[in-house]
């Protein structure tokens, strides 16, 4: 789905990966380390949302989040959401919220076609030793 509607399915509570073998906790990283990991992921989401590229859009999702993303529904969102297909590369980092085994990175996101600003939310955590996306949305 698009960053606008579909990823609200990511809800305010991240989808659990069930990964108990790796106890790396992202909240132990510094803000700078988290931001360095998050920004390329956010840029990729913006780019692939604009392109309507489902496979690329979900490539950094946690496995359970990727499974929750139905390709038909995502394609429909890409086709029908003007915001999801016109996100600007112009965004501002706002901050990080830590909780449990996840961090939420907040962005001020703009559109290349619509006036105004939106709040972007990217939820990150570890799965199988790699930083993955457990939720994302634009409000």
What are these model-predicted stretches?
Residues 2-51:
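Short, low-complexity N-terminal intrinsically disordered segments enriched in polar/charged residues
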Residues 2-16, 51-58, 85-88, 112-117:
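Short, charge-rich amphipathic segments
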Residues 34, 46-49, 53, 70, ...:
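Alpha-helical protein-protein interaction elements
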Residues 40, 55-96:
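Short solvent-exposed beta->alpha transition segments
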């Amino acid at each position: 789905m698009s960053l606008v509607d579909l990823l609200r399915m990511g809800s305010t509570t991240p989808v659990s990966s069930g990964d108990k073998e790796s106890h790396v906790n992202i909240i132990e990283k510094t803000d700078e380390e988290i931001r360095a990991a998050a920004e390329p992921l956010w840029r990729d989401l913006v780019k692939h949302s604009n392109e309507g590229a489902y496979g690329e859009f979900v490539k950094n999702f946690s496995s359970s989040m990727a499974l929750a993303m139905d390709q038909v529904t995502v394609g429909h969102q890409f086709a029908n959401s003007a915001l999801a297909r016109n996100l600007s590369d112009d965004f501002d980092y706002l901050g990080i919220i830590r909780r449990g085994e996840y961090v939420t990175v907040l962005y001020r996101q703009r559109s290349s076609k619509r006036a105004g600003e939106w709040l972007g939310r990217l939820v990150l955590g570890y799965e199988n030793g790699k930083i993955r996306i457990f939720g994302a949305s634009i409000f």
